[in-house]
From Swiss-Prot:
The keyword Transport applies. The record marks 116-117 as: Cleavage. The record marks 17, 28 as: Interaction with LIR (LC3 nteracting Region) motif of ATG3. A lipid is attached at residue 116 (Phosphatidylethanolamine amidated glycine). The gene is GABARAP. GO terms for cellular component: actin cytoskeleton; autophagosome; autophagosome membrane; axoneme; cytoplasmic vesicle; cytosol; GABA-ergic synapse; Golgi membrane. Residues 1-22 are annotated as: Interaction with beta-tubulin. This is Gamma-aminobutyric acid receptor-associated protein. InterPro entries: Atg8-like, Ubiquitin-like_domsf. The keyword rRNA-binding does not apply. Changing residue 24 to Q: No effect on WDFY3-binding. Impaired WDFY3-binding, but no effect on SQSTM1-binding. GO terms for biological process: autophagosome assembly; autophagosome maturation; cellular response to nitrogen starvation; chemical synaptic transmission; extrinsic apoptotic signaling pathway via death domain receptors; microtubule cytoskeleton organization; mitophagy; positive regulation of proteasomal ubiquitin-dependent protein catabolic process. It comes from Homo sapiens (Human). Heart, brain, placenta, liver, skeletal muscle, kidney and pancreas.
């Protein structure tokens, strides 16, 4: 997926910012969250999050659900590198495995469980 954040901010600027964040907040993870291209779901009020490393993916789902005002029966799926991450994993584990060279973790969200639909 193409992340708008990457297109709006040059790599060096992102990397510099990501590096500063990691040094200043070593127990937190910088995350960029954007809606998948064809998702029929609400927009987030912001894209950039700084979350505790020990927060689980499941807890992060809850946080994002609240921010886009989803009802309990509405589906929400995350994609990290086109794969749905396990809800039991911590954001720190996800970050260690999937962060990019700019020190950010990128997560796409959708109402569909198949990426790109």
């Amino acid at each position: 997926m193409k992340f708008v954040y990457k297109e709006e901010h040059p790599f060096e600027k992102r990397r510099s910012e990501g590096e500063k964040i990691r040094k200043k907040y070593p127990d937190r993870v910088p995350v960029i969250v954007e809606k998948a291209p064809k998702a029929r779901i609400g927009d987030l009020d912001k894209k950039k999050y700084l979350v505790p490393s020990d927060l689980t993916v499941g807890q992060f789902y809850f946080l994002i659900r609240k921010r886009i005002h989803l009802r309990a029966e509405d589906a929400l799926f995350f994609f990290v590198n086109n794969v749905i991450p396990p809800t039991s994993a911590t954001m720190g584990q996800l970050y260690q495995e999937h962060h990019e060279e700019d020190f950010f973790l990128y997560i796409a969200y959708s109402d569909e469980s198949v990426y790109g639909l």
